[in-house]
Amino acid sequence: MTITNRQVAEHAFLLPLYEDDYFPDHVLDRGRAVLLRLCERIEAERPGDLAALYRMTEGATEEFNALEAEFEAAGSEIETVAREEIGEAFWFIAQAYGFADADGEQLIAAREW
């Protein structure tokens, strides 16, 4: 599915992490794919309220939880900078799809990082 939201389609997700050699590109690519799948799901299912959005972001957050082992295997981790950038990406997505009242912490409440 192609992302139709222009703001999202043009956004460089996780760019500051790609610019830091500490974070392996191949794992970041998987994280970026998680974010894009979330966007595709939002466009396909069109959540009607914050509760529905939070259910969607919970699944995407759990996918990031699973990536932690891959970061560690590559000598990296989801540390403070990465946590902030990933959280910001979730918040950006919520805003881009019209959820101005989304709580940044609630968007990633299922995080283990």
Predicted regions and their residues:
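Mature extracytoplasmic domains of secretory-pathway proteins
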Residues: 42-68
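Charged, amphipathic alpha-helical oligomerization/scaffolding segments
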Residues: 30-37, 56-59, 63-66, 85, ...
